[in-house]
């Protein structure tokens, strides 16, 4: 992780109905080119199809982009994503292990907010990237942000949604379980007192899952491109579409 916090400030949604509609976009693996391909799939075309389908399904309050925007640290991938998302709907971004936060990623400051605040929910963005590593961790800055968000949500009687790139639980997949948040137990220990009002969403694992761990519901979301086979010992692809 970078020494200075990448994520700062709040984005506020104060004028909407009791229903909050968030769309998670994750692991786009864009290259900055319309011709970029990952494992045989054109990543711009697949990301565009997913985003367009989400927009067509109804109004969206905010996109939550949970990392691996770039396929391999390509600096133009971030403008490419911004173009796909458009300007009509706000979006908050996290880096993944394939993103280089030292380059152009950090220049997209409007998307790098720590929290999305609404009347009934707070959304907390936590950075799990560890520079030079595939797996993730939460440093003290991120853990402190978690503790502060729990305190504020409790004081204001709000539910709390936490977004990360790396998941905070086992995926029952040997090769992926080496890449989860290595100090997840510490984070979940802090969250335990607010477990019944909390939800964690993550990316990285290129598959859908829904589990309750330590009383906390945890979701992972498919990539907008290729999917990984669930519960596999070694790297394996699934034949599911995004």
Report residues per predicted region.
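Metal-dependent catalytic neighborhoods of phosphoester/phosphodiester hydrolases
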Residues: 34-36, 65-86, 100-112, 173-175, ...
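Beta-strand-turn-beta hairpins that frame and shape the catalytic cleft
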Residues: 13-24, 115-125, 150-161, 212-218
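Acidic/histidine-rich helix-loop elements
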Residues: 23-46, 71, 100-110, 131-140, ...
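Binuclear metal-dependent hydrolase catalytic cores centered on His/Asp/Glu-rich metal-binding motifs
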Residues: 118-159, 176-186
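Active-site-proximal segments of metal-dependent phosphoesterases and phosphodiesterases across multiple
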Residues: 34-38, 156-198, 229
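Active-site neighborhood of phospho(di)ester-bond hydrolases with catalytic His/Asp-centered motifs
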Residues: 24-26, 62-68, 91-97, 126-127, ...
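N-terminal active-site segment of His-dependent metallophosphoesterases
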Residues: 1-80, 171
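Binuclear metal-dependent phosphoesterase catalytic core
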Residues: 2-7, 16, 25, 190, ...
């Amino acid at each position: 992780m970078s020494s200075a916090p990448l994520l700062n400030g709040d984005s506020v949604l104060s004028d909407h109905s009791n229903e909050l509609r968030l769309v998670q976009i994750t692991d786009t693996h864009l290259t900055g080119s319309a011709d970029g391909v990952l494992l045989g799939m054109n990543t711009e075309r697949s990301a565009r199809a997913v985003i367009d389908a989400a927009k067509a399904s109804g109004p969206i309050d905010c996109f939550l982009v949970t990392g691996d925007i770039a396929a391999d640290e390509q600096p133009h991938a971030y403008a490419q994503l911004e173009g796909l998302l458009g300007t009509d709907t706000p979006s908050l971004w996290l880096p993944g292990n394939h993103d280089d936060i030292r380059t152009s990623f950090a220049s997209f400051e409007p998307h790098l907010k720590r929290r999305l605040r609404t009347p009934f929910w707070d959304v907390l963005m936590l950075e799990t990237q560890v520079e030079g590593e595939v797996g993730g961790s939460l440093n003290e800055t991120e853990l402190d942000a978690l503790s502060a968000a729990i305190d504020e949500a409790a004081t204001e009687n709000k539910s709390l949604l936490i977004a990360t790139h790396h998941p905070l639980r086992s995926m029952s997949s040997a090769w992926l379980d080496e890449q989860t948040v290595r100090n997840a137990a510490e984070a979940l220990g802090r969250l335990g007192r607010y477990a019944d009002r909390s939800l964690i969403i993550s990316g990285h694992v290129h598959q859908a899952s829904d589990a309750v761990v330590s009383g906390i519901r945890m979701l992972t979301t498919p990539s907008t491109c290729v999917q990984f086979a669930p519960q596999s010992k070694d790297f394996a692809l699934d034949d599911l579409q995004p």
